[in-house]
């Protein structure tokens, strides 16, 4: 595992062909050729981890746009990378837990112990209907997720495992080989409702947050640590998302910010954004400008000159953040620039 004394730099793999809802062509296609090239290069320039989102439809560019499957992509990336941790999203409503545990354990072996999970309770009703998955009320999703995690943990850690619950049933399940990382690959999850936060504090290893200021993130970290203590469990890790770019002058920063936040409510991703708002419970309302960038990324304040971003990264470290999950556009070019101006100067 990487040293815990240094904040780690991760990035979202562009499986949707971009992160900007108002820029139609971001110069980074949703293709295996692009993501494999990006992953291999990212290892060389200082990135530690990549988050691979799981959606069967494209919520950024519109439902008709291409999107890559998370788990077949992650298996292929595991075989062509050497050091990059692969945090792959998984929605329990789309995966039987015991079968999924078998597949994930195999990918952990392909990667030689570099797999991590990002467990996500489904929010997109249209996608669920299209793909024949159950779509439950908000808190019911977390009941399913809790039981799903119990089965996952059981088959990964026990020689044989049986379970009879509300959602899942297994009888004497044997899973070999076990994952490389013991007792299991790290489990990350995010959420802002009470049901989500209590579940994560009790059953997960790390809490990931949408973009927000260091001050608000610090309060969330303190809250989750308190919840964790109530369950008598050990240290959690914390990650936060952010949209990032660096320029040499504040004038150039302002110009790029204007380009990416040029609001178009008729963009194909706008309807998907509205469905996401209806399917989640947020602690803070979003502005229409923030809609332009995925995952509330602008709130993290990771745009500016290299010196300004260095200062903001330091504030996140002080807030208790272990991992930044960054989005860029166009991805490869901006990741190179960010590495040169920020990562390699730390």
Question: Where do the model's predicted regions map?
Answer:
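Active-site mouth loops of central-metabolism enzymes
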Residues: 18-33, 89-98, 134, 181-192, ...
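Alpha-helix-loop-beta-strand connector modules within alpha/beta enzyme cores
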Residues: 61-87, 144-148, 230, 336-346
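N-terminal beta1-alpha1-beta2 module of alpha/beta enzyme domains
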Residues: 1-80, 180-185
């Amino acid at each position: 595992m990487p040293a815990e004394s240094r904040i780690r730099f991760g990035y979202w793999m562009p499986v949707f062909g971009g992160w900007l809802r108002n820029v139609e062509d971001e110069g980074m296609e949703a293709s295996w050729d692009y993501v494999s090239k990006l992953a291999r290069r990212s290892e060389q320039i200082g990135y530690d981890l990549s988050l691979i989102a799981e959606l069967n439809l494209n919520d950024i560019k519109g439902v008709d746009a291409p999107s890559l499957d998370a788990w077949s992509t992650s298996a292929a990336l595991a075989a062509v990378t050497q050091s990059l941790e692969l945090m792959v999203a998984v929605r329990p409503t789309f995966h039987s837990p015991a079968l999924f545990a078998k597949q994930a354990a195999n990918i952990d072996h392909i990667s030689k112990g570099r797999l991590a999970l990002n467990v996500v309770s489904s929010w997109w009703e249209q996608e669920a209907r299209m793909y024949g998955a159950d779509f439950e009320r908000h808190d019911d999703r977390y009941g399913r997720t809790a039981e799903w995690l119990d089965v996952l943990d059981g088959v990964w850690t026990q020689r044989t495992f049986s379970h009879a619950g509300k959602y899942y049933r297994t009888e004497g399940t044997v899973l070999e080989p076990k994952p490389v990382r013991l007792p299991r690959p790290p489990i990350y999850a995010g959420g802002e409702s009470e049901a989500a936060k209590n579940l994560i504090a009790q059953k997960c290893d790390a809490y990931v947050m949408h973009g927000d200021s260091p001050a608000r993130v610090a309060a969330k970290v303190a809250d989750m640590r308190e919840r964790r203590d109530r369950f008598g469990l050990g240290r959690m890790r914390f990650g936060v998302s952010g949209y990032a770019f660096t320029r040499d002058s504040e004038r150039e920063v302002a110009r790029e910010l204007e380009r990416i936040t040029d609001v178009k409510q008729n963009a194909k991703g706008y309807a998907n954004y509205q469905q996401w708002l209806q399917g989640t419970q947020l602690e803070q309302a979003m502005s229409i400008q923030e809609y332009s960038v995925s995952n509330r990324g602008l709130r993290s304040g990771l745009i500016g000159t290299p010196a300004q971003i260095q200062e903001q990264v330091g504030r996140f470290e002080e807030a208790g953040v272990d991992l930044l999950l960054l989005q860029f556009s166009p991805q490869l070019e901006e990741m190179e620039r960010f590495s040169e101006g920020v990562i390699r100067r730390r």
